[in-house]
A protein has these predicted regions:
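Membrane-embedded helix-loop-helix hairpins and adjacent transmembrane boundary segments
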Residues: 1-561
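Solvent-exposed, acidic/flexible segments
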Residues: 319, 323, 573, 577, ...
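Residue-level detector of well-ordered alpha-helical segments, enriched
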Residues: 357, 361, 603-604, 655
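Immediate post-signal-peptide N-terminus of mature secreted/exported proteins
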Residues: 551-582
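Charged, low-complexity interaction regions
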Residues: 567-576, 592-602, 619-624, 642-649
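Extended non-catalytic scaffold regions that mediate assembly and binding
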Residues: 572, 580-584, 588-601, 630, ...
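Composition-driven recognition of long, low-complexity, acid-poor segments enriched in small hydrophobic
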Residues: 580, 584, 608, 612, ...
């Protein structure tokens, strides 16, 4: 049923798109690259939204929300401010010039060399960063949603990944290279409707599941209140000073990055260049802004609900696997018969992003290099043909290179690190070019070079040297400093050696430049809504929390869940339980404040068991020697679980459980024997390459038999008495 609903939705979207655009002209530059400048505001809004939205947003932003809470909505909500700026200031400038690309505008403003350099920068990062990343993340999502491992048994994960990448890539090529911008825009609109339905559908089923696990009597709003009450500090728009997006960065680097992306990024704003007129473009941009305000509901809230379920032990997630949060939530709450539809919607979003980037790459090459440098007199048919050939070549290269991203430690880190290298310098010269009249092309060229080199050094340079240079400043503040340096360079240059004649922008008469009469009112209302959203969930006190890591309370809650199970099974009295919980939280905080990495799964597990073991050993009179042996074993296994594969981790857990059982019951001789033999069984299993879990279980079983022979019925009695404790420990290790 999943694969059937997937195919049906894609077929419906493709057929409807063909029916709508079947008579369009794609033989001319304007027809192919700008949809004949005929796009209306619904198409522009949907195309902007879908070109932006792909699996790196759906998966990455929800994963960040799982770790950080509501504060990560900044990437969605601050985008609205940028879209208002686009409608009010940037779009009139671009449309008045009649340009097809951003580098073409820079060529008009500064000169041919500046436009060519900008063209090369855009193309380089689209081909080597954006397109492969879209293909890879989309393929991973497609593989999981459609369960390709079951559909294609016998194939390796690598082979399945290649198949998924080429499937998405070839579909994207068909839409982008043969249909042009209008085909992409129509498909984006259809997928956009499906995405909104699918995104809100996930929220509906997730909140319904919250109600189900609480007795099934809660309404949707009551379910949302349950999540909020359980984790109130996650519902804070301001975040903490050490959050991924501290509140202060909303006015510095986060704003600048959003302004570049929504106001000057060719992949995005090419849709607005195809508008019928300025009014249609402004309405489309502002409608997109309104839709972006809904983004946190399906890009942030699901991640927070996933955290709620994880803390309840219903989802196998921790802070190190937050990238899996959205996928696991979808699998957990969505009925099977809807999985195919949602998969098709998600892949539609991927196709929209891929189509947008590929179409923009073709446009940049055809207009900037082929017609601009190689064949200036080329007729439209040849220009379009050159774009299609170039697009096909880079699509094949990207489909071949995308699987290599599987070896990247974090694709989201890869994206964030490389994006700033080109977007800050480009945004600086565009803004200065629009606001000034005398900055010469040499100043812009130097600023581009200095900006790329400087940010590349700050991103990939020696960490100690970068730390000294920046003084530990937040990376988004650093981006702002670089931006201001580049603006200063161009400002000083224009004062010392200005261009001979002031730049005067000419009206190319390409479209009707009559503005939408309600653009200022609509934009103002959007800005008010942004302020209200932030104010509604603001917690100013969190801004003063300088000592705490972004979300140590998450580890507090997870640790408390584990500890409560074990202490209840061990019949520790409530007063002592409170003391132990307080000590566990203090130990986690102390670890976070140290020079080591923040607390993670292994650290939390280790702290919980060592703390309980210490208190229980004292109460039961267990010797210090055996308690020390237990602590060492916990240390060793915690370290191993953080480094080794899951099967080795699972295999070594019975050794801890068996030894923990023996120690807490005071069977000192058997504990020592179990410890040694279980360790030996684990080592042997690892060396021989056998199934580690079976080997250790067999080893532990053999040890238990020998201990039973030595101690008689005593061990059997003890084992039966604490079987519930063992089950709790086992489930905790697996769940965490």
């Amino acid at each position: 049923m999943t694969i059937v609903s997937f195919i049906l939705f894609l077929a419906f979207a493709g057929a409807l798109t063909w029916f709508i655009v079947r008579k369009q002209d794609v033989g001319s530059n304007t027809g192919f690259f700008l949809a004949g400048r005929s796009l209306t505001y619904p198409l522009i809004a949907a195309s902007l939204l879908l070109t932006n939205l792909s699996t790196e947003q759906m998966v990455g932003l929800n994963g960040s929300a799982f770790r950080q809470g509501l504060c990560v909505m900044a990437w969605e909500v601050v985008a609205v401010v940028s879209l208002v700026a686009m409608a009010w200031f940037f779009l009139p400038k671009f449309l008045k010039s009649g340009v097809t690309t951003v580098p073409e505008y820079l060529e008009l403003r500064y000169g041919k060399s500046t436009g060519t350099i900008a063209n090369a920068i855009f193309l380089f990062f689209y081909v080597f960063l954006l397109l492969p990343l879209i293909l890879y993340t989309g393929a991973v999502a497609l593989k999981q949603i459609l369960d390709f491992n079951t559909l294609l048994p016998g194939l390796s994960d690598t082979a399945i990944l290649w198949i998924a990448i080429w499937l998405i890539g070839l579909m994207g090529c068909a839409y982008s290279l043969f249909g042009g911008l209008r085909t992409c825009a129509v498909l984006d609109t259809i997928n956009g409707i499906g995405l909104l339905i699918g995104g809100f559908m996930i929220v509906f089923f997730a909140l319904s599941k919250v109600s189900a696990v609480n007795g099934g009597e809660l309404s949707l709003m009551q379910s949302l209140s349950e999540v909020k009450n359980a984790h109130a500090d996650m519902f804070n728009t301001f975040g903490r000073p050490k959050s991924e997006v501290p509140f202060g960065t909303l006015f510095t680097g986060v704003l600048i990055i959003n302004m570049f992306y929504w106001c000057t990024n060719q992949q995005i704003i090419q849709r607005t260049f195809g508008a019928k007129g300025l009014a249609e473009g402004q309405k489309g941009v502002l409608l997109c802004g309104l839709l972006k305000l809904l983004g946190p509901l399906y890009l942030v809230l699901p991640g927070m609900i996933a955290f709620y379920f994880a803390c309840k032990g219903l989802l196998d997630l921790d802070m190190n696997s937050s990238a899996l949060a959205y996928g696991k939530l979808v699998t957990f709450v969505l009925p099977n018969w809807l999985a195919g539809f949602f998969g098709a919607v998600l892949i539609g979003a991927v196709l929209s992003s891929f189509n947008g980037a590929l179409n923009s790459s073709c446009t940049l090459f055809s207009i900037g290099f082929y017609k601009g440098l190689i064949n200036p007199q080329a007729e439209d048919r040849k220009v379009v043909r050159s774009g299609r050939i170039f697009g096909f070549i880079i699509a094949v290269l990207c489909m071949c290179g995308a699987p290599l991203l599987a070896n990247t430690s974090s694709i989201f880190d890869y994206l964030q690190k490389t994006n700033g290298i080109y977007n800050i310098p480009l945004f600086a010269i565009i803004v200065v070019g629009m606001l000034t009249k005398f900055v010469p092309k040499m100043a812009a060229n130097v600023a581009l070079f200095v900006g790329v080199v400087l940010i590349a050094f700050l991103t990939f340079g020696d960490p100690e040297l970068v730390q000294k240079v920046t003084g530990g400043m937040n990376i988004y503040h650093v981006d702002t400093v670089v931006f201001l340096i580049l603006v200063a360079i161009m400002g000083v240059w224009s004062f010392v050696a200005p261009r001979k004649e002031a730049f005067v922008q000419q009206d190319a008469k390409a479209v009707d430049m009559t503005p939408w009469k309600f653009s200022w009112v609509a934009g103002g209302l959007l800005l008010v809504l942004v302020a209200l959203i932030y104010a509604s969930f603001a917690n100013v006190s969190a801004l003063k929390d300088n000592e705490t890591e972004p979300v140590p309370h998450h580890w507090h809650m997870i640790a408390t869940e584990i500890a409560n199970k074990e202490m209840t099974a061990l019949e520790i009295d409530e007063t002592e339980q409170g003391v132990i919980i307080t000590e566990i939280k203090a130990s986690i905080d102390e670890f976070d404040k140290s020079d080591k990495k923040p607390a993670d799964t292994a650290v939390t597990r280790k702290i919980v068991y060592q703390t309980i073991g210490k208190h229980y050993a004292k109460a039961k009179g267990i010797s210090d020697a055996h308690l020390e042996a237990f602590n060492k074993l916990v240390e060793r296994e915690a370290a191993k679980s953080a480094k080794e594969a899951d099967d080795i981790k699972a295999a070594t857990e019975p050794a801890i459980r068996k030894f923990f059982k023996a120690v807490i019951e005071g069977i000192e001789e058997s504990a020592e024997t179990v410890k040694k033999d279980a360790e030996k069984a684990a080592d042997d299993a690892k060396k021989e390459g056998e199934s580690a879990l079976d080997s250790i279980n067999n080893g532990v079983e053999g040890v238990s038999n020998s201990v039973g022979q030595a101690l008689g019925g005593a061990v059997d009695s003890v084992s039966q008495g604490i079987q519930g404790t063992l089950d709790g420990v086992s489930n905790t290790f697996k769940d965490l």
